[in-house]
Amino acid sequence: MQLPLLFYTSVLAPAIGLAAPVAQNEALSKRENLCSLPAPPALCTPDPSVTVEETAKRAYAFYRSFVVDGDPRTMFSLIDSTYTQHHPGYASGPQNIWPLFCNGNKLGNEASTAWCFVAATNMSYARYSTTDRWRWVDGCVHEHWDQGERIPSEGCYKLPANRSQ
């Protein structure tokens, strides 16, 4: 009687342990390297019903994914298919910047960077080693500038305290 019990505990216990769910490290999953993909896995679909508050939340999520988390999947899910690039030397369209950001490298942390969304202009800003500006249309990043930009000192949208995305 004890021999089968010994068998079950020595053979089945490790197998059951392997079947248990493993907690994922969120920081590692955000820094996913997607460069094996020829294009972003998903882009933003413009939706004219997206509110100012939702756009501000999306702008914060974009800043986090681009600068702080190194999360190309989320970053590109907030860029529309007609993305216009105003940086000399770079073509417009998300597929043209995909190779620059697919690797999941982060650019800074929240303590050393800043972000702002100005509802009056539908523009968001991120400051890290440079300052970028994006125009949002129907809840999606539509245009980008990064030369001579400054983050506004006032007029930045205040997100609710929980900053849910």
Cite the ranges covered by each PLM segment.
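Bacterial N-terminal signal peptides
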Residues: 9-14
